[in-house]
Amino acid sequence: MSHGFETTTSFHFYIFHGFSVGKSNQCAILIVSLRNQLACDKITKRVGKMDKRIYIIGAGFAGQTIADDIKRKKIFGKVNAFIDDNKDIIGTTIDGIPVLGPISSVTSILSNSELDEAIIAIPSAPTERIREIYETLTQNGFNHIKILPGISQVIEGTAHLVQTREIDPLDILGRTPVTISLKESLGYLRGKRVFITGAGGSIGSELSRQLLSGGAERLYLFGHGENSICGIYRELRLLQAEGVGEKATIVPIIGDMRDREYVDYIVRQTKCNVIFHCAAYKHVPMMEENQVAAVENNVFGTKNLLDAALAHKVDRFVLISTDKAVAPVSVYGVSKMICEKLVLDAAKRAAENQSFMFVRFGNVLGSRGSILPVFQNQIKTGGPITVTDEKMERFFMTIPEACSLVLQTGGVGENGKSYLLDMGEPIKIIELAKQIIKFSGLEPYKDIDIKIVGSRKGERLIEPLWLKEENPQPTKYKKLLMLDNKEYESSRLEKLLTELHPICFYTKGKENLFRDKALLVKLLCDDCESLRDFYEETKKDGQLRTDLL
């Protein structure tokens, strides 16, 4: 088997699991979606064989229906056989197609067969089942594998029914993502005007996709980057063309959270009912190099939005927060900690029918700049994969599940409350690196090396999700915890913002303070003990530039 990064041989399966013959509306929805995918495959095909040899794993209603489609539309290839666990049909034929089995014997079956491509389509199987079949295939040299969306994605309208995709490592990370009913959780948004900041980012764009099917009257996609806002706007319009949220009005808005007057104007003009505040500068090492920008954008951008929401009677305000706000050791982390305090302070001034809250969670897999795409790119270039420390670990959640829980929280959350998503158990980064290498059909340290490079500025080995005094308590909603708020005086917060403002914004009479990074760090360290201790310790170790303190 070649360990290069361009495959010359691929394999094509359709794997269906958990379906029986009957009048299932879910099956009908799935079959329509699969037919649409086949049609799009036909349209988007650039190169490849027209007589692909296909094996369908699963000989039930869904498998038979898609086999019939392939048979009628010969351009897609030819179904050579079904592979199934049903002893009653193994050894028989269905519409002239032999049924082989069981699925556990897939290796011996395929070793004596000729085939071309692999597409896993397990509409209702858990992650563990996908992992089992995937590993069986890859361990026997079948490495170019694709996957079709699951039935829950199709029903909820979150699946991109355009074409098959390369299998995503999220499918085999060993934990089944949390699923909730969007129809139930988005009831509070029906007929409402929803404003999403950072709508072009990883979290903001996924929130926008899920919101589209929630019955909102209008979606305002607010962001600073025109390319990312244009991208999500076009994507949502395509989804509307497929019948998802077709009645909603989608409005792209280019703007800057730091522009106080414009933020107030746009909130007033849109008359939005709900705000999901996702916008933030988030890359820790980058923000350690641009500390003033982190505070200017994250802190004052959030304050501008909160003030506008209070002034113009926005019903619900939900801040997306991060585990890096817990006993922060970076300027980014401190900026998000201050944002949490700003939300709780706004809640004290909220009108009776207003609710301000934040939702905190750890890392999401697959976001722009996160370790997953970084590792994948490092593998594509031949390695090595770079890991900070063998002991480093993080909590992970998929973007769709995090966003669905955020949307649920927006509906059930109470004014002035703090919420935390249950992230499960932490994952060691080095183990994740090994997993991604194996997933790519390669061997860690043999084909792709793993290099330990040491901590970067603002990083720590373990990121806690809460402080001891926050005492997380379960709610009646799955994977949603409530925190006890840590007391913080409003006057202290106001004083800190007053001192930080002339550093971030040019102020007459205080010109000498503008962009004074050393003063900004000193003010933050004076206010945040964990940041001060971390900076002092790293300074002793010679890891921190002298101009930071």
Regions found by a protein language model. Give the residues of each.
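Strand-loop microenvironment adjacent to phosphate/nucleotide-handling motifs in alpha/beta enzyme folds
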Residues: I54, T179, E184-Y188, D345-N363, ...
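Proline-aspartate-enriched helix->loop->beta-strand connector
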Residues: L110, E114-L115, A216, V267, ...
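Conserved Rossmann-fold NAD(P)-dependent oxidoreductase catalytic core, especially the SDR/UDP-sugar
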Residues: V154-V162, H277, Y281-V284, E288-M337, ...
